[in-house]
Amino acid sequence: MVSLQKLEIELQELFKQKQYSKVIFEITSQTEDEERSSSLCNLLGLSRISNDNKNKDSLSMALRDFKQGYLKEKNTNHAIDCLANFITSSVLLMDLEKDYKFDFSEIINFYESTEKFCINHRPINLAMAMVYRRLNDAKKLILHFKRLIESKKFDSKDLCNYGYWRCFDKDWKQSDFFNFGKFLDQNLKVIPQDQLEEISKEPGPKIRIGFLSADILGGHSITYFLKTILSNYDKKKFEIILILNNPKEDHFTKNFKDLVDETIDIWNLDNVSAVNRVRGLKLDIMIDLMGYTSMNRIEMLKSRTARKQIIWMGYCNTTGLTNMDYIISDPNLIRSNEEKFYAEKVIYLPKIWNSHCGFDLERIENPPPFLKNKFFTFGSFNNFDKINSDVISVWSNILKKINNSKLILKTSKIKHGLERLKALFKENGVLESITFMGREKEFKDHLNAYNEIDIALDTFPYNGVTTSFEAIWMGVPVLTMAGYNFNSRCGESINKNLGMD
């Protein structure tokens, strides 16, 4: 036992030095499976997934190591660490290998048998949130982020994830979002002022506006809402700077760079460097297109990057930041008596808060499909994350009330949560009326799929925006439910501006 303990101490030092291959060799050559403690199994698995030669085989072997370590010493700290890494590595392998099939029930059973010992365990909660994200179970995902918040074991990313996923939760009122936003603002790290450059107060010959985004690539939805604006601004009065926070770039990115006066990339910059880099641009206005969404720079924005900061498009709710001056909305989304529940001052565009640029594709007018089908077809091409139990209940009732009607559900993320959705629709007795479709290879084929739909159904409380504009562009009306805040009234605003309310 003493020799194994000594070996483990030596191996821990090698691991810190990132000599992963040597750690793997020493453990596998000097110990047998049955000799290894949970901590040694964990070290072996971590070395396999940290190694430069990481692949499907190494991940699979790491899974075996983590599982072995968990089962050897259940409910000990080392075993719980193994479980966290087992779950995380399972999700990683799922994402890397399209054909990889994993038994989610095993993960969930392991977790439930250990839950009371790890309610406040940060890696476990993060890992289980990843699992429920892929199972399209927002309610349980939220639970694990809530535990992180309550245990005070969180960072800014956890806070943003929790706030973002609450947008899928009908039980949160706008006052809850407002209070959480204040909590987030109070708990973000503050950059000492002596580390920051001064914000320029001298007006320049033109108004300089920065747009901050991680999503100017790959045909991301935000590009369709931003393109017309950047193509038509008055270059005599304005200078536009794209501030990109993504290491990737494609032809969409290049096209957008050609539309503006300047582009900078802050992906590799820490918050202090990023704030100073942006302050050096001498912006009059910074428009954040991300809010709480993935790859955001919320900590940077807390420290103010321009004279005025505005949240728009990418996140349809309050950020809670005291330094976020404005939120762009419209009268349909935020009522005047609700402004108190938004940390930002509301800028009301007269009709609609944003507009889609459409597509460079020829549209062919088609008759409604029910004329040839002799039955009515509903459809939703929204992300499956937005389809909760209440949405399923409402849609199921619609199918039951309209004789022989059908429903087409289509999403690019169909892999892991599909069986859960099918089970919920089956419970409601309508599964046989539903067709599930995956991602189309060509975007034109995605749009043409709308020709199979008579009416598009919107999700709630998290409305579709891009999918609603797509449906309308293809001549398909959208049935939406009136909401209670910005996020849940997007469909309402779109329809009201079309005179379809």
What kind of feature is each model-predicted range?
Residues 159-160, 283, 374, 399-405, ...:
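Short acidic (Asp/Glu) and glycine-rich catalytic loops that position anionic groups and cofactors
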Residues 448, 455, 459-501:
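Catalytic binding pocket for nucleotide-activated donors in carbohydrate/polymer assembly enzymes
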Residues 265-266, 382-387, 412-414, 441, ...:
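Short, contiguous acidic/charged loop-to-helix segments that flank catalytic cores in large enzymes
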Residues 1-375, 383, 393, 427-430, ...:
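Alpha-helical solenoid repeat scaffolds of the TPR/TPR-like class and their adjacent stem/linker regions
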Residues 237-239, 396-427, 431-432:
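A conserved nucleotide-sugar
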Residues 275, 396-399, 422, 447, ...:
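Generic hydrophobic alpha-helical scaffold/packing signal
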Residues 227, 250-254, 392, 415-422, ...:
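Short, surface-exposed alpha-helical segments at coil->helix boundaries
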